Amino acid sequence: MENKEGIPRHVGIVMDGNGRWAKERGLPRIMGHHAGVRTVEEIGIAARDLGVSHLSLYAFSTENWKRPKGEVMGLMGLFRYYVRGKISAMNRDNMRMRFAGRLVDLPEDVQDILHEAEEQTGNNTGMDLIFCINYGGRQEILDGINRALASGKTEFASEDDLRPYLYLPDVPDPDLLIRTGGELRMSNFWLWSGAYSEYYFSDKYWPDFDAQELKKAIESYARRERRYGTA
């Protein structure tokens, strides 16, 4: 589903390339993640101004726990700092902050900060800024099935029967999925809801991805004809 003038309603981004960006500059990997935060700010504003109603960012996957312990701890610290500091700006800009993933597996204080951000921005009516943290597309499907079974559901007549049990069932399917960093895969991102998404791959590392590149991705999307399997 689209907004006016071919603007995708929901854009999802795999924010890849922070580590390589840092390595090429002789910096620790965590500095690449810090640089990536600045890009989050720019792209969030740009997406809102373009008319995107939902922007989802793949911030930490279920596989990212396998990274060096220091990097994982640094990322958790970055989540604490960024989310807590972002609440007032989100309220000022009338935007909601939301989270998708197995949040229960995160450190308890991080969970508390995420819940606080959702509560304090929950009444805003502008763009949804969604961070996928400890997220995996396969895990989302498995968790959804287990939640459905726990609620007493024993069969699914259609795919719509599973949607209420996914992480964010009210969020529209992503129209456009973008990956930065030059890799040509989506790495377990929105496997269920992204079944009919259009893809756009950028060679730019995430810290170098900017509003102009986002506009290029959306312009590419607007030129495509989405047929959903029809002729």
Task: Give the ranges of each region predicted by the language model.
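Flexible, compositionally biased loop and terminal segments
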Residues: M1-A231
